[in-house]
């Protein structure tokens, strides 16, 4: 019996330890890329889930690399006993004060804080977690996982330049808008002035058309007596045509210098006797008798009205 027990113990001692499998689910937030301004405080969270054993402990390590191609450097580590350790250049007092690793939620959430960011802090941050538990009086790693994020630090000069460029673009847009507004106002004012000028011109033109023109012509005296003839012409309103034509001044009809005289002299014909009218003697002494003879004119000149009649009056005194 003792021999069997010793053989079984030897076989168990020679049995291999359990292999480490990547069963942990590790994620880093914010990510995959996060931007911060120079001088701000950055916070990175490492979430852990899917542990294989409930009683296992976690060892968290943060690595830093300036780029994907560069070598990763261990920054800080939290052991399974929750002790924080700093490594390399990050163990110096200047950088050590700027790094803080805390366990927010036991076995699930870990926070890395980088205070007062500098341009040299820009790069890739990797969180690697290992699940450890005690197996046969030895600490054994059961699973592990990792996740990374990229942090970009924007310098103050670059941010100022970008803000200045944005303000410059906005001001340029408003300047263009102001110019367009001024042009639109000028066009509106000019159109109003032109409209008023057209209205005034039309009113003046209509007044000129509706005005009546009179022409007075004084005929020369006859050889036989004094005769005055007046001719008045009225310009009728003509309908407007498609195109405006020049107004021709109204020319009065031509009046001959002298009334036509018959070539032969006719003896004056006495008037028919009229009824005697008894008038006072004083009035009879001052009476003067006249003989009126109507003569047809020769062919009328072109343009002269045919309704014109010329008269010749001969005066004779009757001696009583």
UniProtKB/Swiss-Prot annotation:
<feature type="transmembrane region" description="Helical">
    <location>
        <begin position="181"/>
        <end position="201"/>
    </location>
</feature>
<protein>
    <recommendedName>
        <fullName>V-set and transmembrane domain-containing protein 4</fullName>
    </recommendedName>
</protein>
<keyword id="KW-0732">Signal</keyword>
<feature type="topological domain" description="Cytoplasmic">
    <location>
        <begin position="202"/>
        <end position="320"/>
    </location>
</feature>
<feature type="glycosylation site" description="N-linked (GlcNAc...) asparagine">
    <location>
        <position position="25"/>
    </location>
</feature>
<feature type="topological domain" description="Extracellular">
    <location>
        <begin position="24"/>
        <end position="180"/>
    </location>
</feature>
<dbReference type="GO" id="GO:0097601">
    <property type="term" value="P:retina blood vessel maintenance"/>
</dbReference>
<feature type="disulfide bond">
    <location>
        <begin position="46"/>
        <end position="127"/>
    </location>
</feature>
<dbReference type="GO" id="GO:0005886">
    <property type="term" value="C:plasma membrane"/>
</dbReference>
<dbReference type="InterPro" id="IPR013106">
    <property type="entry name" value="Ig_V-set"/>
</dbReference>
<keyword id="KW-0393">Immunoglobulin domain</keyword>
<dbReference type="InterPro" id="IPR013783">
    <property type="entry name" value="Ig-like_fold"/>
</dbReference>
<dbReference type="InterPro" id="IPR051102">
    <property type="entry name" value="IgSF_V-set/TM_domain"/>
</dbReference>
<dbReference type="GO" id="GO:0042311">
    <property type="term" value="P:vasodilation"/>
</dbReference>
<dbReference type="InterPro" id="IPR036179">
    <property type="entry name" value="Ig-like_dom_sf"/>
</dbReference>
<comment type="function">
    <text>Peptide Lv enhances L-type voltage-gated calcium channel (L-VGCC) currents in retinal photoreceptors.</text>
</comment>
<keyword id="KW-0964">Secreted</keyword>
<feature type="domain" description="Ig-like">
    <location>
        <begin position="24"/>
        <end position="155"/>
    </location>
</feature>
<dbReference type="GO" id="GO:0002040">
    <property type="term" value="P:sprouting angiogenesis"/>
</dbReference>
<dbReference type="GO" id="GO:0005576">
    <property type="term" value="C:extracellular region"/>
</dbReference>
<dbReference type="GO" id="GO:0001935">
    <property type="term" value="P:endothelial cell proliferation"/>
</dbReference>
<dbReference type="GO" id="GO:0043542">
    <property type="term" value="P:endothelial cell migration"/>
</dbReference>
<dbReference type="InterPro" id="IPR007110">
    <property type="entry name" value="Ig-like_dom"/>
</dbReference>
<keyword id="KW-0325">Glycoprotein</keyword>
<keyword id="KW-0472">Membrane</keyword>
<keyword id="KW-0812">Transmembrane</keyword>
<feature type="signal peptide">
    <location>
        <begin position="1"/>
        <end position="23"/>
    </location>
</feature>
<dbReference type="Pfam" id="PF07686">
    <property type="entry name" value="V-set"/>
</dbReference>
<keyword id="KW-1003">Cell membrane</keyword>
<dbReference type="GO" id="GO:0061298">
    <property type="term" value="P:retina vasculature development in camera-type eye"/>
</dbReference>
<keyword id="KW-1015">Disulfide bond</keyword>
<feature type="glycosylation site" description="N-linked (GlcNAc...) asparagine">
    <location>
        <position position="144"/>
    </location>
</feature>
<dbReference type="InterPro" id="IPR003599">
    <property type="entry name" value="Ig_sub"/>
</dbReference>
<keyword id="KW-1133">Transmembrane helix</keyword>
<dbReference type="GO" id="GO:0016020">
    <property type="term" value="C:membrane"/>
</dbReference>
<feature type="glycosylation site" description="N-linked (GlcNAc...) asparagine">
    <location>
        <position position="89"/>
    </location>
</feature>
<feature type="glycosylation site" description="N-linked (GlcNAc...) asparagine">
    <location>
        <position position="41"/>
    </location>
</feature>
């Amino acid at each position: 019996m003792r021999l069997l027990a010793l053989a079984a113990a030897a076989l168990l001692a020679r049995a291999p330890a359990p292999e480490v499998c990547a069963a942990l689910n590790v994620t880093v937030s914010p990510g995959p890329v996060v931007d911060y301004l120079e001088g701000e405080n950055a916070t990175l969270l490492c979430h852990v889930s899917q542990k294989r054993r409930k009683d296992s402990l976690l060892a968290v390590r943060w690595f830093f690399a300036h780029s994907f191609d560069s070598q990763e450097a261990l920054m800080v580590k939290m052991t399974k006993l929750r002790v924080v350790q700093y490594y390399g250049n990050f163990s110096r007092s200047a950088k050590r004060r700027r790094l803080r690793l805390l366990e927010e939620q036991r076995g699930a959430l870990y926070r890395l804080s980088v205070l007062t960011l500098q341009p040299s802090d820009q790069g890739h941050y990797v969180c690697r977690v290992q699940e450890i538990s005690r197996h046969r009086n030895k600490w054994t790693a059961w699973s592990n996982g990792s996740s990374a994020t990229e942090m970009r630090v924007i310098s103050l000069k670059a941010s100022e330049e970008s803000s200045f460029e944005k303000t410059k673009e906005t001001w340029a847009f408003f300047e263009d808008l102001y110019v367009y507004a001024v042009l639109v106002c000028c066009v509106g004012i000019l159109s109003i002035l032109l409209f008023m000028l057209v209205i005034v011109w039309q009113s003046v033109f209509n007044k000129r058309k509706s005005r009546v023109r009179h022409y007075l012509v004084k005929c020369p005296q006859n050889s036989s007596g004094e005769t005055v003839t007046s001719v008045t012409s009225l310009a009728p309103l003509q309908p407007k045509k498609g195109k405006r034509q020049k107004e021709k001044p109204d020319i009065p009809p031509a009046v001959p210098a002298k009334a036509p005289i018959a070539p032969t002299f006719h003896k004056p014909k006495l008037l028919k006797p009229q009824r005697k009218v008894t008038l006072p003697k004083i009035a009879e002494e001052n009476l003067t008798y006249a003989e009126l003879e109507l003569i047809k004119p020769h062919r009328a000149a072109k343009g002269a009205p045919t309704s014109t009649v010329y008269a010749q009056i001969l005066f004779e005194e009757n001696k009583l």
